Regions:
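Asp-based, Mg2+/Mn2+-dependent phosphohydrolase catalytic module
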Residues: 13, 26-27, 32-141
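Short, acidic loop-to-helix structural element flanking the phosphoryl-transfer center
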Residues: 1-21, 27, 31, 60
Length: 141
């Protein structure tokens, strides 16, 4: 059962920047899930298995489709996922990585582990402040 979650919508708003959905599921399913959760409008684009010509994560080909389409520098992107093999692929391409998982030790290729996506704004802004010495208003690690 899917539910609308105010904390998730609030976190997506606070993150700012360009947000993309990259899913191995079919487009119609992804759109239905995002709609049911009330969060579709917070994403700039949705990339489904069809969008990547059936090259699912963790294939680098799918990541390249997104990065080319949006002219993204991988070193200025954060990839959030719950699957370690997808995070490992993203890290090899130069993206910062966030693993959504319970209390498990994180591998070296994971930059940040959170229990919930709703924690992202707090962690990303804190990390950016430590890295630059000044408050961050948006952007990846």
């Amino acid at each position: 059962m899917l539910v609308r979650e105010n904390a998730l919508r609030h976190a997506l708003v606070r993150l700012g920047g360009t947000k993309l959905v990259f899913s191995n599921a079919p487009r119609h399913y992804v759109e239905q899930v995002l709609g049911a959760m009330g969060i579709r409008r917070h994403f700039d684009a949705v990339y489904s298995i069809e969008s990547t010509r059936y090259r699912p994560k963790p294939s680098s080909a799918g990541f390249h489709v997104l990065m080319r389409a949006h002219k993204l520098d991988p070193h200025r992107c954060v990839f959030v996922d719950d699957m370690l093999e997808n995070l490992h692929a993203a890290k090899r391409l130069g993206l910062a990585t966030v693993w959504v998982a319970g209390g498990v030790a994180k591998p070296r290729y994971v930059d940040l582990r959170v229990a919930s996506v709703t924690e992202l704004p707090r962690h990303l802004f804190r990390h950016a402040f430590r890295a630059t010495g000044r408050p961050a208003t948006r952007g990846p690690f």
